[in-house]
């Protein structure tokens, strides 16, 4: 099975280390453009653009990067409760047309009650999922060209329609991740691809089985994806040393403050991430080569696959064997790590790469000339 490999745009900040300003990097449009163009040239299928008050607006970022990329798809957040589903459908169709069919959408219900209240959304966890189901039903039908009347508990529309359809038919694909039963019910009914954060394979297998069963009960099939960080190096020892360096500036106070802040979230997925490490920096390898160090201070995806290329590829294949065909990776800093993943991991996987245009480079594809005159030898694979 060919795998779809996506990268990540760090619109909330980037750097060499977690939890410190040391080694931090200014994330401006030029830097995001560098990462997007690198991902495009290296053969990543798309990029996930995060959402939330700590991030630049994902829609504007995606639109700004369309002219400087050729094949890269943009996985952009849909926020039920923050925007009307009919307006969101028009925006989605426009982005899909502007990008010539490179738009994908990620339904994000939100998990931070404080942030949601700041955006004017005052619904509890269950109510947010009720509203998200209504939002998605309307959004899908409008994008598919239907005239929609809908009288729901949270959303009511009358005569909603779309005049300018998207490039992708019947509409751009919808992605979604959530670990609660309400989230799985939504996924089974509404989405094309269900995402999970990087839990141990046994836990992921259980979630996949649950969603697959719920979807089958509705006569549907759902694809599956996973969101993970990656720390890949030429040797396993180098990879684990890089993982240690990533959290080398973290002190106990910073970890405690981060965990206290994340504890207010009502996201079941966030609670499952936190349970993997318990706020303790000891014993962070929670499954072979699955490291929970990122989650000590980062919300959302908090685990990384760590190892050399063949080792990480073997772990990726374990997840693929569960039915996962889409992997959304990231690494710190995101520009350099995109190259490491492409150079050290891709050769060991069957990666579904966008077709690249045939161009003639200004320099040879063999690396730097030896003594200005000799073509370097290729390294034998043994």
From Swiss-Prot:
Gene3D superfamilies reported for this sequence: Luciferase-like domain (3.20.20.30)
Family affiliation: Belongs to the SsuD family.
Protein name per UniProt: Alkanesulfonate monooxygenase
EC number(s) reported in the record: 1.14.14.5
Alphabetized UniProt keyword annotations: Flavoprotein, FMN, Monooxygenase, Oxidoreductase
Keyword Oxidoreductase appears in the UniProt entry: yes
SUPFAM superfamilies to which the protein is assigned, alphabetical: Bacterial luciferase-like
InterPro entries referenced in this protein's UniProt entry, alphabetically: Alkanesulphonate_mOase_FMN-dep (IPR019911), Luciferase-like_dom (IPR011251), Luciferase-like_sf (IPR036661), SsuD_RutA_monooxygenase (IPR050172)
Function per UniProt: Catalyzes the desulfonation of aliphatic sulfonates.
Short name of any one Pfam family annotated for the protein: Bac_luciferase
Gene: ssuD
Reactions that this protein is recorded to catalyse: an alkanesulfonate + FMNH2 + O2 = an aldehyde + FMN + sulfite + H2O + 2 H(+)
Additional information: FMNH(2) which is absolutely required for this enzymatic reaction, is provided by SsuE.
Source organism of the structure: Buttiauxella sp. (strain PNBS)
